[in-house]
Amino acid sequence: LSATKISEFNDRVIELGNEKILPVAAIFGANASGKSNVQEAFKYMVYYVLRSFAFGGDVDEKKTKSEFMQPTPFLFDNESKDAPSTFEVYFIGDDSDKYRQYNYGFSVDNKGVCEEWLNICAKSARGKFKSIFYRNRETGELDLSGLPKKSHDNLQTSLENEALIVSL
């Protein structure tokens, strides 16, 4: 969570490169307003990133794994219940003694991964991101240009509809 310009509690702010980060975030709201759903969405995202490579494979195994693969849609809206669920995070990584900002996300539906991307903030332009990889099931696009060339063939061979690139 990025810090604002409010100067109260400056001793709690952590500086990573050009970013000022708060070490704690809070979610509050009325009963049944969705606080637990935010936590469940993060848990699902972590689980999918760590385990999606196990969702592919044998057809019989896919049937049992598919129940874990599918996120719970927002059911109070007819358009949303059939739409893909999208998960996206921004994070800061330590890259050779320089803190770099990354953007990672993916969209999934009941057929698997619809879209996946990983971007890195360009060194020269604050706030502008450069693609490390991008894939889109609908268009068939698979751009691995930000990854080492020697890994392209292995990734293309190993990649299944249900698996995320970061899980391989």
Where are these regions (language model features)?
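Pre-Walker A-like glycine/lysine-rich segment at the N-terminus of P-loop NTPase domains
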Residues: L1-Y44
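Solvent-exposed, flexible loop/coil residues
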Residues: K5, N78-S80, R137
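Residue-level signal for secondary-structure boundary sites
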Residues: S7-F9, D95-D97, C114
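Short, charged/polar low-complexity linear motifs in solvent-exposed/disordered segments
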Residues: I14, F53-D58, F133, E162
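Short C-terminal domain-edge/linker segments immediately following a structured domain
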Residues: E15-N18, F28-S33, G57-V59, C121-S124, ...
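Conserved P-loop NTP-binding catalytic core
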Residues: K20, A26, E40-N103, N110
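Short catalytic/ligand-binding loop motif for oxyanion handling, primarily in non-cytosolic enzymes
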Residues: S36, Y47, C114-E115
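Electropositive, glycine-dotted interaction segments
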Residues: K98-L168
